[in-house]
Amino acid sequence: MKTISANSQTVKRDWYIIDAEGKTLGRMAAEIAHRLRGKHKPEYTPHVDTGDYIVVINAEKVRVTGNKAKDKMYHHHTGYIGGLKSISFEKLIQKAPERTIETAVKGMLPKGPLGRAMFKKLKVYAGESHPHTAQQPQALNV
């Protein structure tokens, strides 16, 4: 019996939809990262992108536990001297709710070209509507 190694031509990718309303950010992000990598499939291969497409709706209604809404800070640098910017979870969820989920998932994926390819399969939307109805995504309970 030969060992089967997946390649990009043999991988079958499914579409899943997750409703983030009332879900805890970290627990949901861990499951999304797991599925984007393809670790739930028997043909998982570490050096091949075997993951599925994930559509997340209601990103504005995701929750965090404890005082993280006020205390959790997101940092980025503008590239200019003294350009370190910080924003709290509370303000970021009002300004760009998609970024909270995207940042959490991106930190859980591999760093490098393969991780960037996996991240492109994540689609996050603030509200109920999304443009991926033609792909007929299956509901996924996290």
UniProtKB/Swiss-Prot annotation:
Alphabetized GO MF terms? mRNA binding; structural constituent of ribosome
Any GO BP annotation: translation
User: Which Pfam families does this chain map to?
Assistant: Ribosomal_L13
InterPro entries reported in the protein's UniProt record:
Ribosomal_uL13 (IPR005822), Ribosomal_uL13_bac-type (IPR005823), Ribosomal_uL13_CS (IPR023563), Ribosomal_uL13_sf (IPR036899)
User: What are the record's GO terms for cellular component?
Assistant: cytosolic large ribosomal subunit
Is Ribosomal protein there in the keyword field? yes
Keyword annotations for this protein, in alphabetical order, are: Ribonucleoprotein, Ribosomal protein
Whether S-adenosyl-L-methionine counts among this entry's keywords is no
| Cited function | This protein is one of the early assembly proteins of the 50S ribosomal subunit, although it is not seen to bind rRNA by itself. It is important during the early stages of 50S assembly.
Query: Subunit structure of this entry?
Result: Part of the 50S ribosomal subunit.
Family, per entry: Belongs to the universal ribosomal protein uL13 family.
What's the name of the protein? Large ribosomal subunit protein uL13
